[in-house]
């Protein structure tokens, strides 16, 4: 293995060899459903990262060789001037995506004072795709418990325990602590597991639902949900039990956003109210997607534009037009 650091532009910290195992994508049961059009992963060039920021790409299989699927690189960002007390932001991409797709949002997190991890995970199918058609509202709880913590039975997805989000994050933090001991990544672990009280969780689409579920089940530093977590039975509009349950994370730490024109805007607005997210902590995005985007026809570009590079609108200077909204949602990591 070869470790490296870039201060000015995105680099590969752990060399990715030709023998890397490609992700074996999961297949939704109803591939023609509108719910399957959440997000497709475009190929794009990462923007430059400002000087003074270290960026790593690390394969999930390098931190845990038993992980064979969904093996696109995790992205790690650290600003040189961060104090030792800086907290951690973990971002989860949407369905079919990878962390690099939302690099500008990750950079915004680093600029807000967090150490940042964009975490790859099993995201071939989402909860609304899988459990939305299921008449059992608890399908969503089983789905997310298995995908995130690896400790529930769900016949609807084939995720393995070692592929769980918690295991991926735990193994990555241990790996980073060995790779860069002077950065003390072990501060974000307790008894070998993620120290959620020092971790802000954020995500887009399916990833927003991941962040929300973790916030419901663990006391985290902050929850940032970009257009996610509307788990319900579509035929009856009955919410998943976890949506209506009490939150382990105090509600004043919850933040969320959605686009007023995205197809599931009404569902998200209702879900955020049921969860109890303070109305002052919710941003409704209104700008048109970047007209130069290269996304396939038929996708909900308003939904994708919340954080995805090439679709997120830009200002007159070519910078993300939602920068101020992102900064509000992120708060301070220091």
Give the residues covered by each predicted segment.
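The feature captures the conserved acid-bearing segment of alpha/beta-hydrolase catalytic domains
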Residues: 80-81, 221-314
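Boundary at the C-terminal end of the N-terminal hydrophobic targeting segment
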Residues: 21-25
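Serine-hydrolase catalytic machinery in alpha/beta-hydrolase-like enzymes
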Residues: 94-192
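Bacterial N-terminal signal peptides
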Residues: 6-17
């Amino acid at each position: 293995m070869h470790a490296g650091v870039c201060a000015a532009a995105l680099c590969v910290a752990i060399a990715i060899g030709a023998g890397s195992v490609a992700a074996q994508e999961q297949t939704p049961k109803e591939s023609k459903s509108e719910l399957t059009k959440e997000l497709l992963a475009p190929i794009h060039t990462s923007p430059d990262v400002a000087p003074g920021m270290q960026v790593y790409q690390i394969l999930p299989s390098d931190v845990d060789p038993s992980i064979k699927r969904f093996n696109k690189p995790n992205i790690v960002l650290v600003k040189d001037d961060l104090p030792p007390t800086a907290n951690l932001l973990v971002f989860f991409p949407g369905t079919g995506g990878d962390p690099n797709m939302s690099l500008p949002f990750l950079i915004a997190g680093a600029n807000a004072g967090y150490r940042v991890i964009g975490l790859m995970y099993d995201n071939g199918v989402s909860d609304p795709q899988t459990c939305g058609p299921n008449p059992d509202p608890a399908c969503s709880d089983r789905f997310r418990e298995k995908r995130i913590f690896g400790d529930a039975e769900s016949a609807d997805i084939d995720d393995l325990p070692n592929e769980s989000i918690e295991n991926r994050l735990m193994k990555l933090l241990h790996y980073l602590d060995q790779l860069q001991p002077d950065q003390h990544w072990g501060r974000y672990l307790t008894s070998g597991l993620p120290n959620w009280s020092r971790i802000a969780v954020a995500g887009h689409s399916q990833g927003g639902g991941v962040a929300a579920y973790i916030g419901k089940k663990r006391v985290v530093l902050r929850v940032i949900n970009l257009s996610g977590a509307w788990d319900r039975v579509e035929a009856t509009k009955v919410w998943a039990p976890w949506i209506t349950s009490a939150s382990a994370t105090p509600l004043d730490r919850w933040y969320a956003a959605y686009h007023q024109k995205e197809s599931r805007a009404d569902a998200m607005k209702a879900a955020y109210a049921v969860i109890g997210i303070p109305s002052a902590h919710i941003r409704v995005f209104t700008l048109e997607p970047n007209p130069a985007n290269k996304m396939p026809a038929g996708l909900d570009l308003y939904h994708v534009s919340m954080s995805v590079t090439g679709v997120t609108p830009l200002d007159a200077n070519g910078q993300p037009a939602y920068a101020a909204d992102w900064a509000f949602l992120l708060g301070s990591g220091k």
